[in-house]
C-alpha cells in the first residue's frame, strides 16, 4: 500500500488536469472521468491520488500513452510533447464535480 503522506505532497504532480472533450463528457454518463497524468506514474499511484484528492472510491483505472505530434509554425517544424491519459471509473454513488456551479 502507498503511504498517504506521500500524496499530501505530490498528488498535484501526479494528476495534472481533467480532460473536457465531447468523448470525455459522454464518459461521464458511465461514471468515468478522464485526466492528463504524469507520464511516469503507474495505475496504483493514479488510483491512490484520485482517491486522496477527491475523496471517492476508484474501481478501475485505464491508461494510455498518446504519441507526440508534429506542429508547424510558419516554415519551422516542431513537436508537441507526448502525454499520458487516464480514464478513471468510480463506484456507483461517487461523483467528481468538474464544472463550477453558479
Swiss-Prot record:
Domain of life of the organism encoding this protein: Eukaryota
One Pfam match: Ribosomal_L23
GO MF term set: rRNA binding; structural constituent of ribosome
Gene Ontology biological-process annotations: translation
Keywords, in A-Z order: Chloroplast, Plastid, Ribonucleoprotein, Ribosomal protein, RNA-binding, rRNA-binding
A GO cellular component entry from the record: ribonucleoprotein complex
Chief location category: plastid
Entry-linked Gene3D superfamilies: 3.30.70.330
Localization per record: Plastid, Chloroplast
Keyword Magnesium belongs to the record: no
Function: Binds to 23S rRNA.
Family membership noted in the UniProt record: Belongs to the universal ribosomal protein uL23 family.
Quaternary structure annotation from Swiss-Prot or TrEMBL: Part of the 50S ribosomal subunit.
Protein name: Large ribosomal subunit protein uL23c
Native organism: Trieres chinensis (Marine centric diatom)
